Amino acid sequence: KRVPLHSSYGDLAAQHVEADEVQLDSSSGTVRLADSSGKRIELRSSYGDVSARHVAGELVAKTSSGDVKVEDLRGATATLTSGYGDVLLDGFQGDLSASTSSGTVAVKGFTGTCELKSSYGDVRAEGRIDRLQARSNSGSVRVRALSGSTLEGDWKLASGYGDVELMVPAGLSFELVAKTGYGSLDVQVPVTVPAGGFKNERKLEGRVGDGGKRIELTTSSGNVRLGTQP
């Protein structure tokens, strides 16, 4: 069963919807979905906020101008996109892609794989992370990887003009590359610099623990900080 709802000039709100496909689309207005489920859920607005709360299914939420807010999502994948606005997620387990051209990307209560990007704004994330790509062209990138996080693939955190900060669980092993063009390095974990490694005030390449997958922390202009938490 497919449930499509469309508005050219007005808000859309729906709840308690159950269908294979759920589609809410507004050309100029907010789009809100709550307490609903579907195999695939698409929420789109050209000019307005998009929100989903207590929703189950593969989610695509997109607005050209407005915020995207998602709370308590249950599904395998989520793609959240804003042209001009914030992207906020609280509560999700799966594969996440969240991006905005101008605004903040903030994720918490998360478990899984995430790719986060803001062209002009900050990136924040907290959760149990397996794979991570986080970037801001002009803003800070700050990630707290909670206990239970693993490196199933390389992690990369980067900023063009801003600070980069990563907190990882104590005891996590990885290869480290940390570098800044104009700023300082603050690495609060023991790093072994083997033959072929590198260390100076703006670049550090080495091994943490037993090594393994790579964590890369880079900024063109800003500070880089790496620390641990219980």
Label every PLM stretch briefly.
Residues K1-P230:
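Intrinsically disordered, low-complexity terminal regions
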